[in-house]
Structure formats: structure tokens, C-alpha cells
Regions:
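C-terminal structured domains
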Residues: 143, 156-271
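Small-residue-enriched hydrophobic alpha-helices in membranes
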Residues: 2-56
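A composition-driven signal for long, intrinsically disordered, charge-rich low-complexity tracts
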Residues: 8-12, 16, 28-30, 97-100, ...
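Generic preference for flexible, low-structure residues
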Residues: 16, 22, 27-30, 34, ...
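Core of folded catalytic or high-affinity ligand/protein-binding domains
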Residues: 49-202
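A general marker of short, structured functional hotspots
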Residues: 13, 80, 84, 105, ...
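Proline-rich intrinsically disordered, low-complexity coils
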Residues: 40, 96-99, 104, 224, ...
């Protein structure tokens, strides 16, 4: 790192991990990463009714926020917001503002799942956060990628982002290095398109909700995946392998509870 002229606080985190000082590493991680930049004023783009004092704070009793999400159902097929609703319904996810929902900030990354064309398995989560981290030119954003690797490869973090629980070994799966590299390539091109990088977790996606997915991809410089990444198993949210068995079952149960026919919109669990 010294030879490459790299010197930032996240190096201290890496050193702590390398020496087995996981508790100290976690403290450094929280102080040096993306979450340290959080300010309650950032709540505005999330449309939560009250200020959120922690980046990953949940909002489980906010009728106005829940209604804003529910209104996305009225958008036409192909609109970004409508496709996000499909993403939620297929997996049994609940909207922010309702019980058992993801933190509003974490829900921001669900728009990127749809926009960038990634499914919702753990492997796809690694791809999404690689894309988001590289699209942002602020080095603090790298901590988002470090977080998901610590959750879903090393297990150094037991939990993260107010919802995720650790599940080791997913980056080691065959083809994941190619898929992660391609996600970072696409994120870099997105950053270049913006001229100075873009923080996709701080975008007001509701302002874009009625626009088509294709239009938004063009505006933000989201290029197609490489053929090699697809060959290595990179999936969209709408095909076989793009949803986990647990999510598929949750989607069915949620549809039954709501009295509607379940539709996974083409998604199937991997074989």
C-alpha cells in the first residue's frame, strides 16, 4: 500500500483483521467507514418522517413512508419504481415504514439491484455492493464493500447494515472473482459518467421512480454486464438463480397472506 501511495484509515482496519484484533478492527471500521459520514439531515432523500440518527436505523412505524412505497404499485410496468415493487413482492420483503422492514438507507440499495440487474442471493449482494462502492469516488464508500465481504466471506462481522447476518464463504465460490470484478468495472463506468462519482445510497430514487429502467441506466451510465460475468453465474432478479429458496418461500407466504396470486416475475431459486 505504501509503494502505491495508498494511505487511509481503512488500512488500519485491514491490519487489525490480519492480526486477529477483531474487536479493535470493528471499532476502526465504524469510525473510518461510510457510516461515519452519516448526518440526520441525510434522512431527506429517504423520505422518513423523522430524522434517523444512525445510518442503519430502522423505521418500522412510519405510515407516510410506507404509503410512499405503496404508491409505487400504481406506476406502469417498466418504470423503475414499479420494478422495485415487483422485486419486493417476489421475495416477501416489507416496505420501509412497516414492521420487520429494512432500514430506509439499506432499502436504497434495492433500487440498485433492479437498476444494475442483480438478483438477491448472497452472491448477488456482493456484486451490488461492489457496484455501489466503486460508483462512489469517496474512499469511505469502500467500507460498504468491506462490510459485505466481512459478512459473507470471512464472517469477521456478525451483523451489518441493520439487517444482514453473517454467512461465510460466498466470495470463494467459483466465478465470484470475475463477477465482483465486473461489478466494480460497471460501477467505475457509472462514476466516470457522473464525472465525479455518485453516491447511489444518497440518491432520491422516488424522484426517479416513474422513469423507465432503461432511461435511468442511460442517464447514470449503467452498462451491460460482461459476457464472462454472465457465464460465471451473474443473475438478474428475474431468472432462475436470481432469488434464494428462503426468499421464494417468503414471497409465496406473503402473497397468500395478502390474498393474491404469487408471482415471482420469472425468478426461481438455484438448483
Amino acid at each position: 500500500a505504501r509503494d502505491l501511495g495508498v494511505d487511509n484509515d481503512m488500512l488500519r482496519v485491514a491490519h487489525r483483521y490480519a492480526h486477529g484484533s477483531l474487536g479493535l478492527a470493528l471499532i476502526d471500521f465504524q469510525r473510518s467507514g461510510y457510516m461515519e459520514l452519516w448526518d440526520p439531515s441525510h434522512t431527506t432523500v429517504l423520505h422518513a418522517s423523522g430524522a434517523l440518527h444512525d445510518a442503519w436505523e430502522q423505521s418500522v412505524s412510519d405510515p407516510a413512508l410506507a404509503a410512499r412505497w405503496e404508491a409505487l404499485r400504481d406506476l406502469p410496468d417498466g418504470a423503475l419504481g414499479r420494478e422495485v415493487v415487483k422485486f419486493y413482492d417476489a421475495r416477501g420483503f416489507t416496505f420501509p415504514g412497516t414492521p420487520k422492514s429494512a432500514p430506509p438507507l439499506l432499502a436504497q440499495h434495492d433500487w440498485v439491484h433492479v437498476l444494475a440487474g442483480y438478483g438477491s442471493t448472497v452472491e448477488s449482494e456482493l456484486e451490488v455492493f461492489a457496484f455501489i462502492s466503486r460508483a462512489n469516488d469517496d474512499p469511505h464508500a469502500f467500507s460498504l464493500l468491506a462490510m459485505v465481504i466481512s459478512l459473507f466471506e470471512t464472517g469477521y462481522l456478525a451483523s451489518g447494515a441493520g439487517l444482514f447476518e453473517y454467512d461465510r464463504g460466498h466470495l470463494s465460490h467459483e466465478g465470484m472473482a470475475v463477477r465482483m470484478a465486473d461489478a466494480m468495472r460497471r460501477g467505475a463506468l457509472c462514476a466516470a459518467s457522473a464525472g465525479h462519482g455518485t453516491d447511489l445510497l444518497q440518491r432520491d430514487w422516488f424522484a426517479d421512480a416513474a422513469r423507465s429502467v432503461d432511461e435511468m441506466r442511460g442517464e447514470l451510465g449503467v452498462v451491460p454486464k460482461s459476457d464472462r460475468a454472465i457465464e460465471m453465474g451473474s443473475m438478474t432478479a428475474w431468472e432462475k438463480g436470481g432469488i434464494s429458496p428462503f426468499q421464494y418461500n417468503c414471497g409465496r407466504q406473503a402473497a397468500d397472506a395478502a390474498g393474491r396470486v404469487y408471482d415471482a416475475y420469472g425468478a426461481e431459486p438455484p438448483s
